[in-house]
């Protein structure tokens, strides 16, 4: 349904945001950016 679609969108957005934050943190820590 629509709610499931919205839920999946929110989950994917959260995953994407979390992934980019993790990438930024790890590159800052290892000074590779």
UniProtKB/Swiss-Prot annotation:
Disulfide bonds join 27-33. Keywords: Amphibian defense peptide, Antibiotic, Antimicrobial, Disulfide bond, Secreted. It comes from the Eukaryota. One of its GO terms (cellular component) is extracellular region. One of its GO terms (biological process) is defense response to bacterium. Pfam families: Antimicrobial_2 (PF08023). InterPro entries: Antimicrobial_frog_2. The keyword Electron transport does not apply. Its main location: secreted. The keyword Disulfide bond applies. It is found in: Secreted. Has antibacterial activity against the Gram-positive bacterium S.aureus ATCC 25923 (MIC=18 uM) and the Gram-negative bacterium E.coli ATCC 25726 (MIC=36 uM). Belongs to the frog skin active peptide (FSAP) family. Brevinin subfamily. This is Brevinin-2HSa. It comes from Odorrana hosii (Hose's rock frog).
